[in-house]
Amino acid sequence: MSLEAEVYQHFADNWTYCTIGWVQENVSFDPTPDEEYAIPAIRHTSARIAEVPVDKGLVRNEYIFAISFLVKENSGMASLEGYVDQLKSLYHKKTIKTANYSVFFGPLVTLNGFYEGAHFEVPNVFDLTVFSQ
C-alpha cells in the first residue's frame, strides 16, 4: 500500500470521535448540518536524497497531513477542542509504525476556522517525514 493509504487506514482504525468524511478517496460526500466530521487529506510536498553517494542514500519524503473538522454552526468550541485533544493524543510529535512505513509526525498546528455552509471548518495540520530507499 502507499504511504497515504496506510496513514488513512491508521486514522480510520483509531478515530472514533466523529464521522470521517472521505473526500480524498473518490467517495461522494455530502455533509449534513446536524453531524460533525473529520476530513483527512495528505499531500506529498518534497523528496530529497539525505546521503552521499546519492545512489545509496536514503530519500527523505515530506508530506502534509491535514484534518479539517466540520463542527455544527453556533455550537460553541467544546466539541472542537475535544477533537483537537484527541488528534494530539494520536499523532502530535509521535512516530507511527504502519505495515510498511515508520511515519514521523511533527507538532499539531491548528489554523483559523471559517464558515463553510452549515458548519464551522477548522483545519489542523501535521508535517510528516518518511525515509525510504
Where in the sequence are the language-model features?
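Acidic-leaning, charged glycine-interspersed low-complexity segments
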Residues: 21, 88-133
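Oligomerization/assembly interface segments of phage tail-like spikes and tubes
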Residues: 59-73, 120-131
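Solvent-exposed, well-ordered amphipathic alpha-helical segments
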Residues: 40-44, 62-67, 84-88, 105-108
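Short, solvent-exposed beta-strand/turn "edge" segments of beta-rich domains on protein surfaces
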Residues: 52-60, 114-119
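Charge-dense, low-complexity intrinsically disordered segments
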Residues: 74, 78, 113-116
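Small/polar-rich, solvent-exposed N-terminal microdomains that initiate assembly or binding
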Residues: 1-57, 75-77, 82-83, 89-90, ...
